[in-house]
């Protein structure tokens, strides 16, 4: 299986590069933000045609069962900083881009493989806002208490 991995920052790249031989895992830095990650994913697909792409990085956490340096993998994903309003579609919810899924499900095969390593599965919320205060964290948790 050809695996691609995208990280946002140099420090993440430096931590992961020694763990994976270049002939086994393609690791590239996208820069911070979801648009940069999406662009990097498209370029990685064009150039290397990986079987899967893993987005990896440092993140905060909300669960009492999560400790510093735990590995958390998504069972599902959504945005914490998207709200399109209800003007066009009454069924759109916070975190959903209109016309797209409320949440994106992880690949079941990859999720099971990750769980075998001890990684903790759960909802991951992402966005283009660095959560640097307790108030912002409380706001996110109010929308996604299970995250």
Region locations from a protein language model:
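Glycine-rich phosphate- or other oxyanion-binding loops that anchor nucleotides, phosphorylated ligands
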Residues: 2-3, 7, 14, 18-147
């Amino acid at each position: 299986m050809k695996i691609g991995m995208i990280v946002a920052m140099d420090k993440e790249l430096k931590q992961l590069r020694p763990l994976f031989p270049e002939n086994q895992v393609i690791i590239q830095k996208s820069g911070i933000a979801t648009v940069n990650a999406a662009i990097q994913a498209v370029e990685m697909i064009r150039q290397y045609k990986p079987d899967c792409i893993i987005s990896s990085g440092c993140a905060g956490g909300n669960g009492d069962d999560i400790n510093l340096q735990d590995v958390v993998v998504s069972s599902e994903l959504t945005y914490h900083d998207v709200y399109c309003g209800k003007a066009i579609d009454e069924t759109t919810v916070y975190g959903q881009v209109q016309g797209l899924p409320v949440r994106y499900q992880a690949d079941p095969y990859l999720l099971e493989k990750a769980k075998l390593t001890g990684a903790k599965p759960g909802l991951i919320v992402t966005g283009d806002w660095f959560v640097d205060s307790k108030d912002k964290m409380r706001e996110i948790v109010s929308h996604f208490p299970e995250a």
